[in-house]
Structure formats: C-alpha cells, structure tokens
Amino acid sequence: MPSASLEHTAAEENQNIVLLDLIIQVDKQAERVAFYDAAIDRAIEKAPPKTRATVQALQSLRGVAKLTAVTLVTEIGCFGRFAHASQVMSYTGLVPSEHSSGKKNRRGAITKSGNSHLRRVLVESAWHYRHRPRLAKRQKDLQGALPPTIAAMAWRAQERLHLRYRLLTAKTKPKGKVVTAVARELIGFIWAIGREVEALNLGGRKQVAA
C-alpha cells in the first residue's frame, strides 16, 4: 500500500508540473497578444488620416474587429482602384470558376486565384452572419461617430448577409459553401464602405479618427 500511495503522489506532482507549464505558456501567449495589439494601435495612430478613417469605418460591419479591419485595408490598399464590386470579389478569389462545354457554361468551385490571406479573413468574418441582425454596444457607439450612409451600409449588410445565410442553408447547401457565398457578398459591402470613406474624404474629420 505505501508504494501505491507514493505512486499516486508522484503522479499528482507530475500533473501539477504539466499544469504549471501550460499556465506559463498561456501567460506568455497572452503577453505576446498584448504586445502585438499595442503595436497595431501604434501603427494605426501613425497611419495617414484616410487609412485611420477606413479602419474605423470597416469596424461598423459585423465580424470586422480592429485586426480584421487593419488586414483588409493593408491587403486591399486603395478601394478606388476597383471600379466595381465584382472586381474586388475576383481579387479575393471568391468567385466561382466557370467551365464551358459546347453552348453550356457551368460554374464550379471558387477560383482561389486571388489573395489567400484576405480570403481567409473574409471567410472567418462571414461566419458571424449566421446570427440574427443586431447591434452590439461597440457597434452602436462606433456607428454614432460615423456618417449615416456608412452606418446604413453596415446595417444593410447584416440584414442581407444573414438572409443569404438562411436561404442557402435552407437549401441544405454545405456550410462551407454557404459561408463562402456570404464572404463573397461581404467583400462587396467592405468595398462600398471603403469607397464611401474615400468619396467623403473622411480622413480629415475628427469624429472618425481612430
């Protein structure tokens, strides 16, 4: 019996060591997250006014927090370089591929020929639209500082994309394809808001400064 007790004690000590190591690793990762989060804040502060305004305006969209907004602005750059929403959709590689056979055109999987990092971020954001439209406190506060046109676009995106998600899932489409379709339309709203920021020259307005 004493040997069994010793084995039990040794096992507990080993478990405690492993648990302590995991806690230390979690703390270190939390410190890294805080470090990079602060670095992102500093980068936003040093960015041109128009960039700061765009980053803030995009956060009015559901599923687009600070890091996602920064990624979108960094990867897309000037939204005005795309004349139509379909062009930025193609840039992300979220448009269906097409195959011609005689007189018939068939659509296949998405091309994936565009910016893969941007595409991944959009798909992650698109998952948020499975929930019913609502404004979280952060979004309410943010939209209060934005022009009505941008706030209206963000709300319209919630209504449109949630409905899109519901209709496609009702057709028993695979969830992956449904979210990809939602992501494709989401980039259209992102493009529209980015263009609106540029058109209104919001970079000079204090109420939309980051």
Model-identified regions with their sequence ranges:
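A detector of single, family-specific signature residues
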Residues: 1-210
